Amino acid sequence: MIVLTLCLFLVLYNSVICTSNNECVQVNVTQLPGNENIIRDFLFQNFKEEGTVVVGGYYPTEVWYNCSRTARTQAFKTFSNIHAFYFDMEAMENSTGDARGKPLLVHVHGNPVSIIVYISAYRHDVQGRPKLKHGLLCITKNSTTDYDRFTANQWRDICLGEDRKIPFSVVPTDNGTKLFGLEWNDDYVTAYISDDSHYLNINNNWFNNVTLLYSRSSTATWQHSAAYVYQGVSNFTYYKLNNTNGLKSYELCEDYEYCTGYATNVFAPTPGGYIPEGFSFNNWFMLTNSSTFVSGRFVTNQPLLVNCLWPVPSFGVAAQEFCFEGAQFSQCNGVSLNNTVDVIRFNLNFTTDVQSGMGATVFSLNTTGGVILDISCYNDTVSESSFYSYGEIPFGVIDGPRYCYVLYNGTALKYLGTLPPSVKEIAISKWGHFYINGYNFFSTFPIDCISFNLTTGASGAFWTIAYTSYTEALVQVENTAIKKVTYCNSHVNSIKCSQLTANLQNGFYPVASSEVGLVNKSVVLLPSFYSHTSVNITIDLGMRRSGYGQPVASSLSNISLPMQDNNTDVYCIRSNQFSFYVHSNCKSASWDNIFNSACTDVLEATAVIKTGTCPFSFDKLNNYLTFNKFCLSLNPTGANCKFDVVARTRTNEQGVGSLYVIYEEGDNIVGVPSDNSGLHDLSVLHLDSCTDYNIYGRNGVGIIRKTNSTLLSGLYYTSLSGDLLGFKNVSDGVVYSVTPCEVSAQAAVIDGAIVGAMTSINSELLGLTHWTTTPNFYYYSIYNYTNERVRGTVTDSNDVDCEPIITYSNIGVCKNGALVFINVTHSDGDVQPISTGNVTIPTNFTISVQVEYIQVYTTPVSIDCSRYVCNGNSRCNKLLTQYVSACHTIEQALAMGARLENMEIDSMLFVSENALKLASVEAFNSTDNLDPIYREWPNIGGSWLGGLKDILPSHNSKRKYRSAIEDLLFDKVVTSGLGTVDEDYKRCTGGYDIADLVCAQYYNGIMVLPGVANDDKMAMYTASLAGGITLGALGGGAVSIPFAVAVQARLNYVALQTDVLNKNQQILANAFNQAIGNITQAFGNVNDAIHQTSKGLATVAKALAKVQDVVNTQGQALSHLTVQLQNNFQAISSSISDIYNRLDELSADAQVDRLITGRLTALNAFVSQTLTRQAEVRASRQLAKDKVNECVRSQSQRFGFCGNGTHLFSLANAAPNGMIFFHTVLLPTAYETVTAWSGICASDGNRTFGLVVKDVQLTLFRNLDYKFYLTPRTMYQPRVATSSDFVQIEGCDVLFVNATVIELPSIIPDYIDINQTVQDILENFRPNWTVPELPLDIFNATYLNLTGEINDLEFRSEKLHNTTLELATLIDNINNTLVNLEWLNRIETYVKWPWYVWLLIGLVVIFCIPLLLFCCCSTGCCGCFGCIGSCCHSMCSRRQFESYEPIEKVHVH
């Protein structure tokens, strides 16, 4: 690969061809071997049929160039003001297959796309490049290309897709026998590559200049080398091609007028009679019997299938005759077919503003019955005698009006009107219609042949006569003339017709329903005994001539009804079956009113009964229409409606009377085609095939199948929309199902071809035979699935390795037709905790978890518009095409909305496998997915706890209590003591009462003794007191001193004890009051917590309500849409088939038109609602993305964005059609009001400056002490400001800009006045129709009913709110209740029993123990003494059992 180096700046040149580079020289390519066949083969590429045509285009007929240079670098040349560019390979005569070629690059500039043709150096493929066979054409959006580094690797980056790459081969041994080139216009590009033509539909603005990159020695100047020659084409040229019996010849067409006319008007029909692509349709018009279409695209039946095209340069004066049957196609240009000819089209070409000679003097129409009608025009009003002289029908631009008449034998039968100023096409139908420039100028009886004489003179006129047949086609009309035709003759073309576009973009499209055609008639009626009545209606027409010879129906024409026994003019059906028959008689009269002659020639007339005002047609009465009552009358009295009776002549229709109808709807009587009287079940069923049915009065088209269902009630069963689902045969109880003949399917179209289709039934369609299954549908494709895996398995994205070209939701289709699923994006990485630190919460904040639901996507909806509106009815589908692109707009709006939403969702959402593992409670509460450092801790709901062991009090090993035996043996006295006084006293005395006074204790410096004294102490101190009293006189009073001291010490004990008790009581009271305050505060916090919980439940209920609304909105909308199918929109019925079964075609069209209008309105309302909802979801999806990034992945600094409070952290979880966020926020409970300052203005002498706070999150305020402080706005934490907190600004002036609302966009470019914008939209696009009311009904889609859960949450929230009110009352009661507590320390003292108690206990023990031992050892047969005695006696005595006397126990009860 030769490395290309070039730096290029492109400009647009206005000259024809830039030849400023002297390295490019002209080349005579005719000297190249084999070049004589280049033009011939090139021109005949698209002309395969036999015949003669003239083709025009930007063909290579100008100067060829070869560019080379001696330098080793590349250079470029610019061709400007051209419309096509061609290049060819030049090689030396001795070149071989190994000849070396130089790289070539051609860049065609345009906007928004450009074309690049790149050919690598011929020897080796570029490494890593796909097999391009050395050349590639690429469509790119890159306006500039880096030629310096241009390699094949860039193809993947600059080309728009695989559908915009065309590989080709350039081989030096071709020796100039192949031509390569590009021709472009604003609509498409034609690429001539490798003996083939590629048409690329590209709407583009071309700059008409080309940049050519060439290299050194690109001429064939040495052996084994090759070179290129180039040509830019700016002139339009014509070639005349002839293909006769395989012999091809061509010549340059130099007569511009002749060549232009021939190329514009003459073509060679392709096999099948189709007009080739690219034909201009000059002066071809769409035939219409009503108003003329001005512009637009329509699907219609038009005579565009050409059986023979006869190019006629000129006519002689002799008359020419053209017949519909037995036409001889001996002069056809191209193919000729033997199809039935419906319309003969005379296409006229003439020089502008030149009258075409004499034109045709008269058109003679040979109608049925041999009556010849002449059509001719006159330049002035004429008398009756003037009609005997021929007028004319001039072709071209005429000078003055022409008045046209229908003549018979020189008599004017009807005035037609004035001739158009310019006659360009005349078309005549075999059914009697005469069209001029597409408009139905005149209608008569069917026509057999046409004749006229014509001369073109010297006007340069050019004719074509086309024998055509009707076919369905998509016709594009501009200024009333046909511009483009797309035949609906294939599956892909049927989709084009249904979408009203000739160029299908890549995407999914509903498969157009095909016409059912003629099918069997199925009728289901109740068995009954039928009596039949044949009703014969006789109409006697009287025809005569007017003063000018026109046929006139006489007022004496008579209508006769059968007579009944009541002798009235009202005839009523008395049987339960009837059939109507009409007998028409025609008699003529001369100038009197005696009608006794037969109606011949132009007087021939037929009686026809038209629909009139009745909701059914007369000719449909015998088509199993049912009534409760049906009567005919010639008197309008009491009539419900009327039929119009007319006389149809060769020139017009004339009314002769009316038939009045009196009827009641019901099922008692039925109209039948023939007599079926007697006991019959007239039901006729055609099973398992498409049939036109009438089932218990309900009409339609479908497939009837027998089922195994058993239904006890009902005769027929309908859906919500009113469609028939099934019925029951009352004779045997068998239930039959009714299904559509065709089901809706979605076709995948790529590059204008169908590569796959999705359908709900497993049946081949669209010519696709390979299929696979998915969980929701069957997929048929051109991709051969049977070669890859077993048919019928679920498609997986891993089965086929390809890049999808089109996507819809999570489904993608590749260019080869393979189906892939594309919506899952995997992410790697371990799940880590959001936070591992502790969060400190200030006291004036509370934590709240708030729930928020945001919708992220909507379920895509695809609607088959024509199926919804017409339900497959072919006539309705034709009427639907009159609504231009209504269905296409509806379907494309939904499809494009779904594609856009799918692209946004695919780029937004991804799936983490590790996150999926934690999507259950068990996995979330498990330690398997934790980091190893956390696994050793217990896990409860994701929290790692250290256990509850620290909460329990620790055990004290030191023994502080007595045993149970001590409590039994001693009396326990409980008193109150002072600290450790009692314990120290007991330890000192050691239990000796004599040491009582010696062991006196001191408490706060005061001697004290325990207040409790036992008997020994009391006796001791009593004796001391008595001795002191007795010996007091003798000086022995000192004996009572111990008593006095002990008493005083004990009194001290009591006094100090009382003081301590008072202090303790005060301490306890204070502590208890403080405890009550804490309890009050705790209850207040509980109250706040319950209040917050109540608010939290309210937010959860609100979020769930929003989820329910989101999930059910689409189902409700679809339900509304389905219900509209029951609405008849003021038509006589909501069933299209029933309308066509009851009315004639024209009357039924008017009724069906109402249904179409109403249903399209309902569809528009649904689409508008869907698109509005998608716009809302698109905005909420962006909001969800912002919340994930700001709330979940980080901590938001915006107050209220992530919950209503200061954001801590958020969690996100999936919810139906969206995401639900759990925001943990801080809610302030107390506020401090300050006056904030935006800055400080200071002055220093003559200088004034300002200071503003640097950190916008800080607020400057002045406190009550007139000092300035700074505090964060998130929490009140005032601090003294420092100089580093401020930024100095130049001045203190504040500038305000006064502007109006109109001037705001110039200041703020993205400013939008929402209110004014909405008002403008409403004013400019106010509809002139009323959208129907769409009631809410249950639809058979997924319906999420959370009403009960939401009501329960709201009830619980209300209950919690009431609980907070009750707690507030209880808190007030607690605050008003403070109890004064009294409590004394408990001192336990054990007192020993007296000595005589112990003496009594010892005596009892001494007496009772010997007595108990004696009783146990001496009594009973087994007593110890008895046993010893028996043993001793047995050892000394021979009789062992004589001395033994058993002692029996006597038990007395």
From Swiss-Prot:
Region annotation S2: where it falls in the sequence: 781-1453
Record keywords: Coiled coil, Glycoprotein, Host membrane, Host-virus interaction, Membrane, Signal, Transmembrane, Transmembrane helix, Viral attachment to host cell, Viral envelope protein, Virion, Virulence, Virus entry into host cell
Organism from which the protein derives: Canine coronavirus (strain BGF10)
Chain's role: S1 region attaches the virion to the cell membrane by interacting with host ANPEP/aminopeptidase N, initiating the infection. Binding to the receptor probably induces conformational changes in the S glycoprotein unmasking the fusion peptide of S2 region and activating membranes fusion. S2 region belongs to the class I viral fusion protein. Under the current model, the protein has at least 3 conformational states: pre-fusion native state, pre-hairpin intermediate state, and post-fusion hairpin state.
Origin: domain of life: Viruses
Membrane topology category: Single-pass type I membrane protein
Protein name per UniProt: Spike glycoprotein
Gene3D superfamilies, A to Z: 1.20.5.300, 2.60.40.3130
Region of interest called Heptad repeat 2 (HR2), as start-end residue ranges on this chain: 1309-1406
Intravirion-side positions: 1415-1453
Disulfide bonds: none
A Pfam family this chain is assigned to: CoV_S1
Cleaved signal peptide residues: 1-31
Cell compartment(s), UniProt: Virion membrane; Host endoplasmic reticulum-Golgi intermediate compartment membrane
Cellular component GO terms, alphabetical: host cell endoplasmic reticulum-Golgi intermediate compartment membrane; membrane; viral envelope; virion membrane
Virion surface face residues: 32-1394
Entries under InterPro entries matching the protein: ALPHA_CORONA_SPIKE, CoV_S1_C, S2_sf_CoV, Spike_S1_CoV, Spike_S2_CoV, Spike_S2_CoV_C, Spike_S2_CoV_HR1, Spike_S2_CoV_HR2
Database matches in SUPFAM superfamilies: Coronavirus S2 glycoprotein
Domain observations: The KxHxx motif seems to function as an ER retrieval signal.
Chain residue ranges for the region called Interaction with host ANPEP: 661-805
Cited HAMAP family: ALPHA_CORONA_SPIKE
Chief location category: virion
Motif (KxHxx): 1449-1453
Annotated segments matching region Fusion peptide: 1026-1047
Region (Heptad repeat 1 (HR1)): 1041-1160
Quaternary structure note: Homotrimer. During virus morphogenesis, found in a complex with M and HE proteins. Interacts with host ANPEP.
